[in-house]
């Protein structure tokens, strides 16, 4: 697989335009869901209130994203979530966060059938926690993308629709 950092306006090499049966992963907070736009989000999370995860507004056109993801799955691709839990929390709060994130997905992307959902310890390497770390990852965290790029391709949250449109 060709490894490179994507830049808006560049062409994908032919090998990448013809990918089939790839795995496409998404981070949630700051990528699909605008957690940081929720009023008092940090204070709520520190007090172990998981509601900001459900209250977050979408960061892209989710109708278009759902159409693209459904098309990807019809073409044999698999779709997954790999997202971190909150920092330093109890087991009960971790479970509440998992439930809230899954509710957000069900409410905002109900037509998407997720092949994998991994909601893992904060800071854990995402490339170790999924079935195929040579797939594609969309994540707002540059350090996560840098690690992922050792085997796969990663893109920022700003590029989701453009990249999926070009790959499919």
Q: Where do the protein language model's features map onto the residues?
A:
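Non-catalytic pre-domain segments flanking phosphatase-related domains
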Residues: 1-26
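Alpha-helical substrate-recognition element adjacent to the catalytic core
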Residues: 19-108
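A short acidic, amphipathic alpha-helical/loop segment
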Residues: 64-68, 129-131, 144-151
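Structural alpha-beta junctions
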Residues: 75-76, 106-116, 150-153
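A structural signal for isolated positions on well-ordered beta-strands in alpha/beta enzyme cores
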Residues: 78-80, 118, 136
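Lumenal/extracellular "mature" regions of secretory-pathway glycan-modifying transferases
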Residues: 96-99, 112-119, 154-157
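Donor nucleotide-activated moiety binding/catalytic core segment of transferases
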Residues: 114-134
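Acidic, Mg2+-coordinating phosphoryl-transfer loop and its flanking beta/alpha structural elements
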Residues: 135-168
């Amino acid at each position: 697989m060709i490894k490179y950092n994507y830049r808006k306006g560049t062409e994908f090499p032919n090998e990448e335009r013809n990918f089939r049966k790839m795995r496409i992963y998404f981070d949630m907070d700051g990528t699909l869901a605008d957690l940081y736009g929720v009023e008092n989000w940090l204070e709520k999370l520190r007090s172990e209130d998981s509601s900001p995860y459900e209250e977050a507004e979408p960061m892209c056109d989710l109708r278009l994203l759902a159409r693209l993801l459904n098309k990807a799955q019809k073409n044999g691709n698999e779709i997954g979530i790999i997202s971190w839990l909150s920092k330093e929390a109890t087991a009960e709060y971790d479970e509440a966060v998992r439930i809230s994130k899954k509710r957000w997905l069900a409410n905002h992307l109900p037509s998407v059938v997720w092949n994998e959902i991994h909601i893992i310890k904060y800071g854990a390497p995402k490339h170790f926690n999924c079935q195929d770390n040579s797939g594609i990852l969309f994540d707002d965290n540059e350090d996560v993308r840098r690690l992922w790029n050792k085997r796969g391709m990663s893109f920022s949250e700003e590029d989701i629709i453009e990249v999926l449109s070009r790959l499919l």
